[in-house]
Curated annotation (Swiss-Prot):
Function: Destroys superoxide anion radicals which are normally produced within the cells and which are toxic to biological systems.
Protein name from the UniProt record: Superoxide dismutase [Fe]
GO molecular function: metal ion binding; superoxide dismutase activity
UniProtKB keywords: Iron, Metal-binding, Oxidoreductase
Lineage, uppermost ranks: Bacteria, Bacillati, Bacillota, Bacilli, Lactobacillales
Catalytic activity: 2 superoxide + 2 H(+) = H2O2 + O2
Pfam family of the protein (one): Sod_Fe_C
Cofactor note: Binds 1 Fe cation per subunit.
Cofactor(s) required for function per UniProt: Fe cation
Membership in a protein family: Belongs to the iron/manganese superoxide dismutase family.
């Protein structure tokens, strides 16, 4: 079995004006697709690895043969992270969090605004390429960031929200102003999906 590029769960222009259609085409059809292609190439001589979900694959990097471990880390992480990213966004979404995730955010951070501030710090403070995350770690919400295409799954944490802060995710529209992109992201967060992930992670 090989890994495949998932279709976007919405049209390429569905997240306009916050994420532009050209970026979505490049990000999904080119960048994400390249991670899938390179992951399949990496595991070609280890077909048993392709039987695992990509999330399971990257959750135990020590089980990956050493000669392909870096390639699987980078490309398996890229595939898992982007698949997750498309799913936690939606058109006509955003706004305030709801349900159990709202309660947990308020309890952990004090308010949604305080959580957004901490998330922004993680996202802007990530030097170079990487991701900012809201994760469940030992049953508690935490904000973290990872370099490159590393996933919280590699550290035993479960992501419930994530933002790609590689320049390819925002440069066409936001140029070098990463904070504007981070602010725009909150308009497309799919809180229903975040709640679903949060319920499964607890």
């Amino acid at each position: 079995m090989t890994y495949t590029l998932p279709e976007l769960p919405y049209a390429y222009d569905a997240l306009e004006p916050y994420i532009d259609v050209e970026t979505m085409h490049l990000h999904h059809d080119k960048h994400h697709n390249t991670y899938v292609t390179n992951l399949n190439a990496a595991i070609e001589k280890h077909p048993e690895l392709g039987e695992k979900s990509v999330e399971n694959l990257i959750s135990d990097m020590n089980a990956i043969p050493e000669d392909i471990r870096t390639a699987v880390r980078n490309n398996g992480g890229g595939h898992a992270n982007h698949t997750f990213f498309w799913e936690i966004m939606a058109p006509n979404a955003g706004g305030q969090p709801t349900g159990a995730i709202k309660e947990a955010i308020d309890e952990t951070f004090g308010s949604f605004d305080e959580m957004k501030a901490a998330f922004k710090t993680a996202a802007t403070g990530r030097f170079g390429s990487g991701w900012a995350w809201l994760v469940v770690n030992n049953g508690k919400l935490e904000i973290t960031s990872t370099p490159n295409q590393d996933s919280p799954l590699m550290d035993g944490q479960t992501p419930v929200l994530g933002l790609d802060v590689w320049e390819h995710a925002y440069y066409l529209k936001y140029k070098n102003v990463r904070p504007d992109y981070i602010e725009a992201f909150w308009n497309v967060v799919n809180w229903d999906k975040v709640n679903e992930l949060f319920a499964a992670a607890k």
